[in-house]
Amino acid sequence: REHVLPSVRMHYHVQDAGKVVNVVPDYSRIWVRVRDITKEGLQPVYEQVRKMAGGAAIMANVEHKVSLISGVHDLLPNRVGGAAMQKNLETLGDIQYTQEEIDFALELQRNNGKPELGIDGKIRPLRETLNSPGGGSTDSGDVSYNVPVVSLAATTAPKGVPWHSWSVVASSGMSIGHKGMLHAAKALGMTMVDIFKDSKLREDIKKEFDEKIGEYDYDPYLDPGPPPIDYVD
């Protein structure tokens, strides 16, 4: 991993490695996932991982097969659509929390050894598009290269709590998470109404989309046909 850019993420899980420890298995399988911020950054790393699989097979004197079971593009943002949604978020205002919800959030932060900052439900100004937007993944990237996509993030957990943790599950499953979900749903619904009613807004969104796509010829990573979901346990 030290030979890739900091934006690259690589994960793996051995799905089948034999049955007993003292017998070399006749079959084994590993699931590897590679991520990067852009498709241009992802492709060479993916190709290198494929070469590594081939090299390992040569060293072990075995046959190997690589099955691509998923592949997504990066997200193509739309500033015009984002500005329309930002207006609706500001109309809705900050997410409001009860004292009971704030106390629950503080307790979660204490249990995780994090600063007791409570819940941040403020609506922030629309930022400039970042070249490196940070962590997280979305499966709407391919959609965004075919039609304009507008998305948002809403608070569903206390500030600073590790995202892949039981604390986020606990928070998302109660009123803190429900409020964030409903806030996001309202903003999405209001923005869709604006797009349906405002022909100029639709034209401006499409114009930006066409300019960003340019001459890019969308080509999905997966081969045509049904998705190979039988490869995933």
Where are these regions (language model features)?
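Midchain, well-structured core segments that form catalytic/ion-binding scaffolds
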Residues: R1-Q109
